[in-house]
C-alpha cells in the first residue's frame, strides 16, 4: 500500500490588487482598490478586488459598474450617518456631501462619517508575471521543481511528502514558513490548504480556510483529510464552491435531489449507474470527489495534456462597431490566429466565426428579427455563427484571412453594429508540410508565403509584435496594435514596479 502523501495548495490573496497596493506603498489588507481598465468603460471586468473592498460584498470578478454601484449604496448609508453627526457639508447645490473620504479601511472603520473611496488601478500583466516568478523562486528554495505545479499565476500545488521529515516540520509549519517568506519578500499574503490529496488541499484552501480567523498578516492555513472532509463539508452548500463542480453540473445534480456532497456520496452507493448515464465518464470524478478521493498525483497532473484540438481568439469591442470596421477586426484576428498556428507548427481544417451584436440595435427600435438574452438579462440580436472548411488543412494567411473575411460577409447583418467577435481554428494538427495540389497549385508560391510568415514571426518575437504590421492596422478602429501590447487581453503595463497613473 502506497504511503499517504501530503499536499499544499497556496493562493496569493487578491494577487493583482495586492501587487498594485504594495507598489504604491499601501497595505494590501486595508486599501480599497480594484484592478480594472477604466478606459474600456464601466462594463470592463475587475481583474481583482482588494480584501477590504470585498468586505462590502463586491465580488472579486465584478464588472466595474457593479463595484461603482455598490460603493454608491454604501456611501448613501454613510452620508446619513455624517448628516446625523453634523459632519457633512452642504454644497452650493443645497445637497449634503462628505467632508472627507478615504480608501483606507482602518480610517473608515474608526470614522463612520468618512466617505468610502477606492483606487482604480489599470492592469499591468507583465508586472504580475514578474512578481509571480519571484514568488515561484521562493518556493523553489524549499522544494524541487518536480514537486510543484503552478495552477495559475497566483496559485500552486506542492507535494511536500518527502520534505516534512527532511525539514523536521509539520505540513502546517512548512506552509507557514514559505508563506511568511513570500510575505517578507513581496508584501503579499497568502492562504494555504493542506490535504492528503490534491483535491482536499484545494478545498481546504478554497472553503475551509475562509471560515477560520486570519493571523495578524491575513494568513489562513486549513487542513483536510478524508474523514474531516466528510465531517466538515458533506453538508456544505452551494455545490459550486467545490473544485470542478460548475453551475451546469450542479443543476443536473439538483434535478435528482442531490444538493450536497454528502447527498452525492450516498446516491452513488446504489445509483452509480444512473450517474454514469447522466454525466458519462465524468461521473467517476464526481463520485471520487464526493468521497474525498483524488487518484491523480503530482506526476499525473504534470504530464496531462489537454485534448483540445482548436485555437481561438476572442474580443469584446470597446464600442459598437459598424459592419466595415468589424470586418477589419475579423481580418486582424484571423492574422493573429495565423501567426499562432505558424508558431505552434499547426494547421487547421476549418474556421468558425461568431459575431455578437450590440444591444443598441434593439434599444433603438426597428429590429424585429431573432433575439437572445445576454448575461445581464438584456435583449440583444441573436448572434451570427458560421464555419468555412478549407480544401486542405492550412496555416497560410492568404487562406485563413481571406476566407474569414468572406465568412464574415456571408453571416453578418450589415445593418447591425457588432460588439463581440470570436474566431476559432478547428481540428488543428501538426504541420507536416504537405499540400493538397492540383494542376493549378503553385507550390513554390505556397512555400514562399510560409517562409515569409515564419520570417515575420521571428522578427515579431525578437523585436516586438508591433514591429511588422499591415497598413490596415493603422486605420481608425483597428485594435491590432493595442492587443499586441496586452497579455491575456489586458494591458501588459510596465515591469519596473511603478504603478501607472
Regions found by a protein language model. Give the residues of each.
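A generic structural signal for short beta-strands and their flanking turns/coil linkers
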Residues: 29-31, 349, 384-386, 419-421, ...
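Gly/Gly-Pro- and Ser/Thr-rich, intrinsically disordered tail segments characteristic of DNA damage-repair
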Residues: 1-288, 295-298, 443-501
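DNA-contacting surface of Y-family translesion DNA polymerases
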Residues: 2, 9, 241, 247-417
Amino acid at each position: 500500500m502506497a504511503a499517504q502523501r501530503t499536499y499544499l495548495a497556496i493562493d496569493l490573496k487578491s494577487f493583482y490588487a495586492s501587487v498594485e497596493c504594495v507598489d504604491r506603498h499601501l497595505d494590501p489588507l486595508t486599501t480599497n482598490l480594484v484592478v480594472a481598465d477604466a478606459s474600456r468603460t464601466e462594463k470592463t471586468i475587475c481583474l481583482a478586488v482588494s480584501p477590504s473592498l470585498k468586505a462590502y460584498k463586491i465580488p472579486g470578478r465584478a464588472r466595474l459598474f457593479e463595484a461603482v454601484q455598490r460603493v454608491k449604496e454604501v456611501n448613501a448609508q454613510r452620508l446619513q450617518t455624517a448628516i446625523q453627526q453634523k459632519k457633512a457639508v452642504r454644497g452650493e447645490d443645497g445637497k449634503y456631501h462628505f467632508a472627507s473620504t478615504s480608501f483606507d479601511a482602518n480610517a473608515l472603520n474608526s470614522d463612520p462619517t468618512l466617505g468610502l473611496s477606492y483606487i482604480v488601478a489599470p492592469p499591468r500583466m507583465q508586472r504580475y508575471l514578474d512578481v509571480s516568478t519571484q514568488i515561484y523562486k521562493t518556493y523553489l528554495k524549499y522544494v524541487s521543481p518536480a514537486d510543484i505545479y503552478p495552477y495559475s499565476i497566483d496559485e500552486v500545488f506542492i507535494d511536500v511528502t518527502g520534505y516534512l521529515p527532511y525539514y523536521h516540520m509539520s505540513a502546517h509549519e512548512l506552509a507557514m514558513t514559505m508563506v511568511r517568506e513570500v510575505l517578507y519578500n513581496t508584501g503579499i499574503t497568502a492562504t494555504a490548504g493542506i490535504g492528503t490529496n490534491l483535491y482536499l488541499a484545494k478545498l481546504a484552501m478554497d472553503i475551509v480556510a475562509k471560515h477560520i480567523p486570519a493571523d495578524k498578516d491575513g494568513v489562513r492555513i486549513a487542513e483536510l483529510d478524508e474523514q474531516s472532509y466528510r465531517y466538515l463539508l458533506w453538508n456544505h452548500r452551494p455545490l459550486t464552491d467545490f473544485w470542478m463542480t460548475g453551475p451546469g453540473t450542479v443543476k443536473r445534480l439538483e434535478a435528482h435531489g442531490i444538493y450536497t456532497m454528502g447527498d452525492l456520496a450516498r446516491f452513488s452507493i446504489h445509483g452509480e449507474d444512473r450517474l454514469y448515464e447522466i454525466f458519462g465518464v465524468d461521473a467517476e470524478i464526481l463520485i471520487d470527489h464526493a468521497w474525498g478521493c483524488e487518484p491523480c498525483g503530482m506526476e499525473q497532473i504534470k504530464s496531462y495534456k489537454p485534448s483540445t484540438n482548436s485555437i481561438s481568439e476572442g474580443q469584446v469591442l470597446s464600442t459598437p462597431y459598424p459592419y466595415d470596421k468589424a470586418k477589419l477586426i475579423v481580418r486582424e484576428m484571423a492574422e493573429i490566429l495565423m501567426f499562432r498556428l505558424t508558431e505552434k507548427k499547426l494547421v487547421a481544417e476549418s474556421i468558425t466565426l461568431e459575431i455578437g451584436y450590440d444591444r443598441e440595435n434593439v434599444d433603438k427600435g426597428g429590429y424585429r428579427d431573432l433575439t437572445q438574452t445576454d448575461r445581464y438579462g438584456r435583449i440583444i440580436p441573436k448572434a451570427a455563427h458560421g464555419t468555412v472548411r478549407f480544401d486542405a488543412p492550412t496555416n497560410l494567411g492568404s487562406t485563413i484571412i481571406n476566407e474569414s473575411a468572406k465568412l464574415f460577409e456571408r453571416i453578418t447583418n450589415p445593418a447591425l453594429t457588432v460588439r463581440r467577435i470570436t474566431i476559432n481554428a478547428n481540428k488543428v494538427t501538426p504541420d507536416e508540410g504537405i499540400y493538397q495540389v492540383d494542376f493549378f497549385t503553385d507550390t513554390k508560391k505556397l512555400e514562399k508565403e510560409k517562409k515569409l510568415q515564419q520570417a515575420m514571426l521571428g522578427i515579431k518575437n525578437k523585436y516586438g509584435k508591433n514591429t511588422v504590421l499591415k497598413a490596415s492596422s493603422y486605420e481608425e478602429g483597428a485594435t491590432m496594435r493595442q492587443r499586441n501590447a496586452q497579455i491575456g487581453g489586458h494591458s501588459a503595463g510596465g515591469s519596473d514596479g511603478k504603478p501607472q497613473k
